């Protein structure tokens, strides 16, 4: 391949160092710039605290993203497209600029990092290569979080395991792979993965990565002419930074993340140290998932570039030195790189034949050497010219070494790593022992894979147990809190028990005092019992007097209840009549609530209140009657005006009808005159035709007479006479025709005018007819309304008369009730006076206690009377306010109902919007899931082949290659 460059079989890891500028917090803290850059052309050394470090390249803080990419990563693009594996990862402490170096700002041509630039470069190189090459590119994106591999393209895959393929190359089993055909597809995958990556805020970095991310680009290419297949993997790794808890202030989950990050980075450092030592036979790749994934990149088949990112601040001097030491050790690690070529059956066969021929030649040479060796062992001295020259043997055995070396480089390089690892053991171990050891290693690796699976299952089981333990701890914490609550409650109860004991003691003392007092009181009670017996005798006497008064009072109550019933019946009848009158006067309005059944059990105050309401209703009906009378007078006036307008309309209608009849007669006469003119026209036309016939006859006679010479003169005379007659006839005919035409034009003009007038009259007639019908309809409506008003007025007049009679009746009944009340009060006062006199005539009018009781009862009666009157007044006021309050309540209820309806509609609308939004979200998710499933998942994926020398190629069903894409070729991005 022309774009290939020569790469040695053994290649050192390339280490570049990049320093970021001081940030704001470091400048505010007063940190100094402790790094020094010696002035050399190559820019490959750095000095800190007097110690110099050498790297492949050192970038100062002002180095641009483009410069970093060109120096550190651009060369790997051609290696990957040539079939080699490549790895680029950034190493350093937290907030040292690793993510900025690897990703940067995607889409910004100045600030974008290595990953977007290398993606654009890969596609640009593909589009510029030979046309007969076809590429298939797929990408994976996952992170190592809390020492668990989590797929960033499918968040449901949270604990993936690492396995090895048939060539012992580690890979992440079950990771999502997406086929891509353009840089835009790759950027979409990157953005999707970035949105799922774990980040957090620490004291040193607002966007601190909490996991190691691995972005894998797998490029497979096929030469369509010779079916040669190459494959290359490019690992783009963004490591999480090492942290010091004292500086980052991590706690809780962030602290656990920091522990796992430091643990995996420590394992990475151990692997680098073991590889740099060169004498260790065991490399601890399996100590961490990170080193297990990067096994091929560290001492394996890959071209690796490490970007160590450092801080120049004195605050981070110790971490910077540690990072520089890591880079210096990594620079000594050697990788064995080879082309990942998939040979065809013919190629394997050809190589087999060559190796077979080579083996046969070598066997012949070995036999010669064995013969010579046997002669030497037999004591025979072999002459110099008979001795076999080893240099000639090697040259003869490998006549085409240069050609074969290029063809067998892949097979030899694939075994180079194993030869290096087994170099110290190959001298003492036989071939059979090596085979046994290889089988044993295979078995041990298989056991390790099984153990990985078991560890994965055990980790999941441990997660479940951890959740159960957390639940149990929560239950224990709740039980502990309840126990503490019960302890405090028990302490409180004990305190209450102690206080209760003290109270019991006090109560016992009080009981003793009460016992003493009881004896004293019992004596006093005996004395009082004697006094009570005497008072009981007096009470019996007073009770008899009270019973007599109670009997009389009951009789008075019966009379009063009888009077109340009579008053109630009268008011019931009165209110019923008032209700009927109100319905007659204002049937559409709400009348007073007259529930007669409710008046039966009411008292006098209720009757007075209802009577007050009746008087108010009567005054209201009077006002309504006056309003109705006024409206009736207005309606009568309007009816008179309407009758006048109707008569005027009828008069105008008669005149218009007369005009219409006149115009119709005139039109008939005009039509007759037109018919006469038409007849005259026809007569004149007939005369013209007859004259033309005579003229033709005369011409024929003239022609006949031309032969006769004798009649020539006569013919001339006749001809002259005939010409003169014809001229006269022609003139007369012309005059008549012109007169007839003028007359026809005048008649036609007159007819047009008559038609216009007739049309206007027809329109006016139709308008008048419509107005007449409308007036008639309004008159009918007014007449019906007037009849209704007259009937209503008559009913109201009758109701007014009935109301006047009812008012007289009510006044008489009220006067009667007033008189009865006066008589009842007088009788009651007389009876009370008699009782008072009788009581005073007894012994001193009773005891002092009874007098006090009577005065107390009288005061209570007066107070109750006042309260009752006040309640009656308040009740009347409330009855007046009740309609207004009911109206306001109805308005409020209507408003509440309207608001409830609006709220319900708003909730329904919100629910509909929410359902629609949820439906759209589910639909989008389903579409995205289907899109993702179309590109990944357990089912077969349709590859997106990319043909070199042009843009992305369209594909048919089943992944077959179609014609070239009409899309324009992607322009190279300035990297």
Curated annotation (Swiss-Prot):
* Annotated keywords: ATP-binding, Coiled coil, Cytoplasm, Cytoskeleton, Microtubule, Motor protein, Nucleotide-binding
InterPro entries tied to this protein: Kinesin-like_fam, Kinesin_motor_CS, Kinesin_motor_dom, Kinesin_motor_dom_sf, P-loop_NTPase
Q: Start and end of every Kinesin motor domain?
A: 12-333
Pfam families per record: Kinesin
- For this protein, the parts annotated as crossing the membrane are none
Q: Which SMART domains match?
A: KISc
Q: What family does the database annotate?
A: Belongs to the TRAFAC class myosin-kinesin ATPase superfamily. Kinesin family. Kinesin subfamily.
The domain comment in this protein's record states: Composed of three structural domains: a large globular N-terminal domain which is responsible for the motor activity of kinesin (it hydrolyzes ATP and binds microtubule), a central alpha-helical coiled coil domain that mediates the heavy chain dimerization; and a small globular C-terminal domain which interacts with other proteins (such as the kinesin light chains), vesicles and membranous organelles.
- Protein function: Kinesin is a microtubule-associated force-producing protein that may play a role in organelle transport. Milt and Miro form an essential protein complex that links Khc to mitochondria for light chain-independent, anterograde transport of mitochondria.
Kindly provide the name given to this protein in its UniProt entry.
Answer: Kinesin heavy chain
Q: Which organism is it from?
A: Drosophila melanogaster (Fruit fly)
Gene symbol here is: Khc
């Amino acid at each position: 391949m022309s774009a290939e460059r020569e790469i040695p079989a053994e290649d050192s890891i390339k280490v570049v160092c990049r320093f970021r500028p001081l940030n704001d917090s470091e400048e505010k803290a007063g940190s100094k710039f402790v790094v020094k850059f010696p002035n050399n052309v190559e820019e490959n050394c750095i000095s800190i605290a007097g110690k110099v470090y050498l790297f492949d390249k050192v970038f100062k803080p002002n180095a641009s993203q483009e410069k970093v990419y060109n120096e550190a990563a651009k060369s790997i693009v051609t290696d990957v497209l040539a079939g080699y594996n490549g790895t680029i990862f950034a190493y350093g402490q937290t907030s040292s600029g690793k993510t900025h170096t690897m990703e940067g700002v995607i889409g910004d041509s100045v600030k974008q990092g290595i990953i977007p630039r290398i993606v654009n470069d890969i596609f640009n190189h593909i589009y510029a290569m030979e046309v007969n090459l076809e590429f298939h590119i797929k990408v994976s994106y996952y992170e190592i979080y809390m020492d668990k591999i989590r797929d960033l393209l499918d968040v449901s895959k949270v604990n993936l395991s690492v396995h090895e393929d048939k060539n012992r190359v580690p890979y992440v089993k079950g990771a999502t792979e997406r086929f891509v055909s353009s840089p835009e597809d790759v950027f979409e995958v990157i953005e999707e993965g970035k949105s799922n990556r774990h980040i957090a805020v620490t004291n040193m970095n607002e966007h601190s990565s909490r996991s190691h991310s691995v972005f894998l680009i797998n490029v497979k290419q096929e030469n369509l002419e010779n079916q040669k297949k190459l494959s290359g993997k490019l690992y783009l790794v963004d490591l999480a930074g090492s942290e010091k808890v004292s500086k980052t202030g991590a706690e809780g989950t962030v602290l656990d993340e920091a522990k796992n990050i430091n643990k995996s980075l420590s394992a990475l450092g151990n692997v680098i140290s073991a590889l740099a030592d060169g004498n260790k036979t065991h490399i601890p790749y399996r100590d961490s998932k990170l080193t297990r994934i990067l096994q091929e990149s560290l001492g394996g088949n890959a071209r690796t570039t490490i970007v160590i990112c450092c801080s120049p601040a004195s605050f981070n001097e110790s971490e910077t030195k540690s990072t520089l030491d890591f880079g210096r050790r990594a620079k000594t690690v050697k990788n064995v790189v080879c082309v990942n070529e998939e040979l065809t059956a013919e190629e394997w066969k050809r190589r087999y034949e060559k190796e077979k021929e080579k083996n046969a030649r070598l066997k012949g040479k070995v036999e010669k050497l064995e013969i010579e060796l046997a002669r030497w062992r037999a004591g025979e001295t072999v002459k110099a010219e008979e001795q076999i020259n080893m240099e000639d043997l090697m040259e003869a055995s490998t006549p085409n070494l240069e050609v074969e070396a290029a063809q067998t480089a892949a097979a030899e390089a694939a075994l180079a790593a194993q030869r290096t690892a087994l170099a110290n053991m190959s001298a003492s171990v036989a071939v059979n022992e090596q085979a046994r050891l290889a089988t044993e290693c295979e078995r041990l690796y298989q056991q390790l894979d099984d153990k990985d699976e078991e560890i994965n299952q055990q980790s999941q089981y441990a997660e479940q147990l951890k959740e159960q333990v957390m639940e149990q701890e929560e239950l224990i914490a709740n039980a502990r809190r309840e126990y503490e609550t019960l302890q405090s409650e028990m302490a409180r109860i004990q305190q209450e028990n102690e206080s209760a004991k003290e109270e019991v003691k006090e109560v016992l003392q009080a009981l003793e005092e009460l016992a003493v007092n009881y004896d004293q009181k019992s004596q006093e009670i005996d004395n009082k019992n004697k006094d009570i017996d005497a008072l009981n005798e007096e009470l019996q006497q007073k009770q008899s007097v009270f019973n007599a008064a109670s009997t009389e009072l009951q009789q008075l109550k019966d009379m009063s209840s009888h009077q109340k019933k009579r008053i109630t019946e009268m008011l019931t009848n009165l209110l019923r009549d008032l209700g009927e009158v109100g319905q007659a006067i204002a049937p559409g309005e709400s009348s007073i609530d007259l529930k007669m059944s409710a008046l039966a059990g009411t008292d006098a105050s209720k009757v007075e209140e209802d009577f007050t309401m009746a008087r108010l209703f009567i005054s209201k009906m009077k006002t309504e009657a006056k309003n109705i009378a006024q409206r009736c007078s207005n309606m009568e006036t309007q009816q008179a005006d309407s009758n006048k307008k109707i008569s005027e309309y009828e008069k105008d209608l008669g005149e218009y009808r007369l005009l219409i009849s006149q115009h119709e007669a005139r039109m008939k006469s005009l039509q007759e005159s037109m018919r006469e003119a038409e007849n005259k026209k026809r007569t004149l036309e007939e005369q013209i035709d007859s004259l033309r016939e005579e003229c033709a006859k005369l011409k024929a006679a003239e022609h006949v007479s031309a032969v006769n010479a004798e009649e020539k003169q006569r013919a001339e005379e006749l001809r002259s006479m005939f010409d003169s007659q014809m001229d006269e006839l022609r003139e007369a005919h012309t005059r008549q025709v012109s007169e007839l035409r003028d007359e026809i034009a005048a008649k036609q003009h007159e007819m047009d005018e008559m038609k216009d007038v007739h049309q206007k009259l027809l329109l006016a007639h139709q308008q008048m007819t419509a107005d007449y019908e409308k007036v008639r309809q309004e008159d009918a409506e007014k007449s019906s309304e007037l009849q209704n008003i007259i009937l209503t007025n008559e009913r109201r007049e009758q109701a007014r008369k009935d109301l006047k009679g009812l008012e007289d009746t009510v006044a008489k009944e009220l006067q009667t009730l007033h008189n009865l009340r006066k008589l009842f009060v007088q009788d009651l006062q007389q009876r009370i006076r008699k009782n008072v006199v009788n009581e005073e005539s007894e012994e001193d009018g009773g005891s002092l206690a009874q007098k006090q009781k009577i005065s107390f009862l009288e005061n209570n009666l007066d107070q109750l009377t006042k309260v009752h009157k006040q309640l009656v007044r308040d009740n009347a006021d409330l009855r007046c306010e009740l309609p207004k309050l009911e109206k306001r309540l109805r308005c409020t209820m209507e408003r509440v109902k309207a608001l409830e309806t609006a709220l319900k509609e708003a909730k329904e609308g919100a629910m509909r919007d929410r359902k629609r939004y949820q439906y759209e979200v589910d639909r989008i998710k389903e579409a995205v899931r289907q899109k993702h499933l179309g590109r990944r998942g357990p089912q077969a994926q349709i590859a997106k082949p990319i043909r070199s020398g042009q843009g992305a190629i369209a594909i048919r069903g089943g992944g077959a290659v179609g014609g070239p894409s009409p899309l324009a070729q992607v322009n190279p991005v300035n990297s």
